């Protein structure tokens, strides 16, 4: 037997995808990752998604080791099959000869440059560990994957030619965003699927910019990453301390949204979910754990989020969102985030937010892709502008049939968290009247402009929907 019964149940959403299958999941479980990170907090989302995905051996090195025991406990509680420990002098040598090992360097420009150049000194074209470089600085960052030593050495040289501070500005949600992208790149390396991100992916979550940089442009984008002129995070933090965000769904999408918002210190998170934790949730729903299987998702999420940020207020709504309770639940929140897994409740939530004049941040995920948009009532499109008619039940792939790569919801949830912060602080450029499409296999982000539908039955010129409606439940989009 390739996997035991518990592993089959845990990784079912991976196994049913032919690109992974049972053999691929076994390969993931046998793989090893070396993580070099400035702080434990920087590495938190990355480690959780690696553990959830089943990476068998995780070795960590932190400049600041405070609270690493708590992180290791959370990772093991999420998935008891993995091993996680600090890197010692023997660690790289124990795994460097394995074809299923890679290295991640995550942190500020100065830190990444230091670690890369240390590796260049000790390695060569015959002894090289495939490496993922993840640079973060406030809203900006840069990601690149190297499977050839010469390309890695050239990038390290480019970084060494610039003078970066050892520790730059706080990473905001770029920590979560980069961590999930790194986890995806690890799986692609291990399984040899998709296209590795061999050109630098530069991103700016404040303005929703995603650019693939050629080698000759790398220095330019490193300099852009280093800049922090357009936003002072200390001012933004002051504006979100009292922010109240409602997350509808504490699953695949709700997990990364809640984690990212907790890490940046928002005031209140409300969680709506009536379900309980199951083992099949744990390849992607990082708020939960093996020890909390059977517990309500909202309570399980509260336990984890309080361990991350004891000061945050968590309001639990252990209920199914319905026509009767939607307005009452939404009423006391500033922003609503859609982490749902079905069309009927999405339409209900969209309508309720429109009538209550609440911004709604939407996302959906399936297999290796995701999309997101931001809906501001009476200022742009609504969900019904995109899909005037609800899809018939069974017309799309069901949850059980489609599968999903565990870290993909993490990418989209991080985007949703960034949108919530920008709306609350009144900064940057949101996804209003735009859709962001993400293809994990190619690490591509595509922005599509939208127009408000003047014939929309809810927000158009002649609306015909004037009250909330109840629909039959179905499950066609995975979260």
For each feature predicted by the language model, list its residue ranges.
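Adenine nucleotide-associated cytosolic modules
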Residues: 1-479
